[in-house]
Design a protein with these regions (language model features):
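Vicinal oxygen chelate
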Residues: 1-3, 12, 34-35, 59, ...
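Short, flexible turn/loop "capping" segments at secondary-structure junctions
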Residues: 2-4, 88-89
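Eukaryotic phosphotyrosine signaling hubs
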Residues: 7-9, 91-95
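Core segments of cupin and vicinal oxygen chelate
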Residues: 13-68, 112, 128
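A short, acidic/glycine-rich surface segment
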Residues: 41-46, 80-85, 124-126
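Amide-forming acyltransferase catalytic core, primarily the GNAT-like/NAT-type
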Residues: 59, 79-80
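Generic beta-structure capping elements
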Residues: 63, 75-77, 150
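Helix-adjacent hinge/juxtasegments
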Residues: 72-76, 86
């Protein structure tokens, strides 16, 4: 095991990092963690392997984990690759999940804020008898979000 390892952040690359950060602040209560990031130069190019790379963005504290909890890092590069179509079953990172009080209401709020529907609200029962009501939606840039609520 790697000594001292703990979860730090998840990164989203955005077309418009400020608009996407605002979406996560307004819809899920994420809190900006200053300072905004603005990097360029040879160290960034070497670290990313992208010649001419420049990036700007911010970290947002995720809700429910206190002042030292993990963040959502939203960056924009000056050089962007095309994004593939949304697919919840693509290998690699699939989605970010938020526990909410009311899944259908949260779904409607995300859609009203520019997100898109991926699937329908469903409830599944685990082998232990717990129930999870959930749905997949996207943020305004097409990143998949799971909205979920657990009950016994």
């Amino acid at each position: 095991m790697i000594a001292g390892a703990k979860y730090g952040h998840t990164n989203l690359i955005a077309k418009d990092w400020k608009a996407l950060a605002r979406f996560y602040e307004e819809q899920f209560g994420c809190i900006p963690v200053p300072p905004e990031r603005d990097f360029k130069g040879s160290d960034l190019e070497r670290g990313t392997g992208i010649p001419g790379a420049e990036l700007r963005g911010a970290h947002l504290r995720l809700p429910g984990h206190g002042a030292e909890g993990p963040t959502l890092e939203i960056f924009n590069y000056n050089i962007l690759k095309e994004k593939p179509d949304v697919a919840v079953n693509r290998p690699g990172f699939g989605h970010i999940a938020f526990v909410v009080n009311d899944v259908p209401s949260a779904r409607e709020a995300v859609l009203a804020a520019g997100g898109q529907a991926v699937g329908e609200v469903v409830t599944l029962t685990t082998a232990a008898g717990s129930k999870v009501t959930w749905v997949y939606v996207t943020d305004p840039e097409g990143n998949v979000i799971e909205l979920q609520s657990w009950s016994k």
